[in-house]
């Protein structure tokens, strides 16, 4: 069977830059699935993406499906014919579905009986016939939240489509996709190269686009070029470019032919906090800021043009003129805001709604102030500083700078607090209250900041759950999942002595009578324990290990972490598998027991040597392990409990649990319950697979 290179390119208007990669990757994944489902042999599927195109190139694509033998078994002979030997309706219906008559069917005989059988040799369809529908289906499944319609057509896509190129080797596959007839015409760069040209063979892509169209279609190559050129440009001015991955991706999705240039701004703007300047450069203009080796912002920025200019100074000058008013605004806001103390903004918080049922930002501030102070007392932080940080926590939201540059919330609070002469840990807490903002983000750096960050997140969790608006599906408008995970990370990684039960109860108490959900405390704790499951799975822990610990519903996050590490280590022990199985057996036995058990094991009722020995071990371990459990030394406890393997095995091998004598039976069940209770002090290891 011959194989050829296949190319599909969809030429469009400018695609959404933040979605470009996901569109291309989804297109490739969808089309690969279509090929596999159709049984079309193929090699590597490579995707390409630029602002005005999505493309796939498939190596070694078979020109047709393989032929295949089809067998369809019909009704049993007894049901296929009546007493007179005439075909039944069931047999005729089956035959019609196969495109034959009953008398054309074969018969299949086995040890179990005889059936009608249809056999056929089905010739594989050509790739040329199959591909158009595959491409259309793959495009229809792209993750596009909002579709566009253009012109008089009723075709919908993420952006208007101008060209569709479908080539199998050197042949155009005729098709109409997204309202466009397929061809071998490709459009180049808007302002450089050839505006349109033809491609003779799929193997020429993407090199022909580079040479004739001045477009780097390879997304990763384009991104790598921007990164390398920006690093070199920064090095030339003695600095380091801030090449954050998200901005690098976005810029790579905005240009087809990247040209990296360096510009500057007036040094006087460096008096403004760097975060505000960086927000303007990165957020609004898509520029890369430059820092010196000490991490101080330089009065330069690097940007990427989408054209090779004969006079680059014109482009540089234009970008400098664009950014200057934005930096001047930041300077004005900074100077204006500092004429007031942060505390002076408190009354205005009363005019901003946090949530309709939960009150204003001033109401939230009062709750955070109280909760941060309470948490500080629990974790040994400065209570006065924590309450002060809580009072000022939302004041910067009322400043001109944060109103204009929203991503500077928190960090501007820190700068203004320092200007006002607030304690340094209070100022830092105002910035770090929102941390961690995302997976892997830094945690608050000092105890006051930890108290404020936890208070802010717990207030939101308690309030939103308290009015029954918990996350549903993918919808999480108040970012409760992130808030819950943030609280857990801070408590676990900072090893704070906080209990989710009392923490949630305190957060709920501060709402007074505003909450309507009577089960809010349990709902919040269950939700947070659910975040543990996702977090620890990402950390590489097995699902059954997590379930074994969650079964105990430990509400102290640091304690949960200690149990997880203990069970994970326990699984490496030679005795673990046998003891997990024994615990499962004990759990099942106790679940079926209907008689009330004794409070203690009565030594006088023990008869068999194996049960006497097990009881002796349990008494010794119970006394020995109490300090271990009290101190959270769960790993050491499980190592000690591993010594029970031999007496437990001996017990089950030689002792009849459900003895006929009631007192003996109940005593043995009580013995097993005491065994299980010891393990349950750490986790339910019966859940380990």
Swiss-Prot record:
<dbReference type="GO" id="GO:0004814">
    <property type="term" value="F:arginine-tRNA ligase activity"/>
</dbReference>
<dbReference type="Pfam" id="PF02092">
    <property type="entry name" value="tRNA_synt_2f"/>
</dbReference>
<keyword id="KW-0963">Cytoplasm</keyword>
<keyword id="KW-0067">ATP-binding</keyword>
<dbReference type="GO" id="GO:0004820">
    <property type="term" value="F:glycine-tRNA ligase activity"/>
</dbReference>
<keyword id="KW-0547">Nucleotide-binding</keyword>
<dbReference type="GO" id="GO:0006426">
    <property type="term" value="P:glycyl-tRNA aminoacylation"/>
</dbReference>
<comment type="subunit">
    <text>Tetramer of two alpha and two beta subunits.</text>
</comment>
<protein>
    <recommendedName>
        <fullName>Glycine--tRNA ligase beta subunit</fullName>
        <ecNumber>6.1.1.14</ecNumber>
    </recommendedName>
</protein>
<dbReference type="GO" id="GO:0005524">
    <property type="term" value="F:ATP binding"/>
</dbReference>
<dbReference type="Pfam" id="PF05746">
    <property type="entry name" value="DALR_1"/>
</dbReference>
<keyword id="KW-0648">Protein biosynthesis</keyword>
<dbReference type="InterPro" id="IPR008909">
    <property type="entry name" value="DALR_anticod-bd"/>
</dbReference>
<keyword id="KW-0436">Ligase</keyword>
<dbReference type="GO" id="GO:0006420">
    <property type="term" value="P:arginyl-tRNA aminoacylation"/>
</dbReference>
<dbReference type="GO" id="GO:0005829">
    <property type="term" value="C:cytosol"/>
</dbReference>
<dbReference type="InterPro" id="IPR006194">
    <property type="entry name" value="Gly-tRNA-synth_heterodimer"/>
</dbReference>
<dbReference type="InterPro" id="IPR015944">
    <property type="entry name" value="Gly-tRNA-synth_bsu"/>
</dbReference>
<comment type="similarity">
    <text>Belongs to the class-II aminoacyl-tRNA synthetase family.</text>
</comment>
<keyword id="KW-0030">Aminoacyl-tRNA synthetase</keyword>
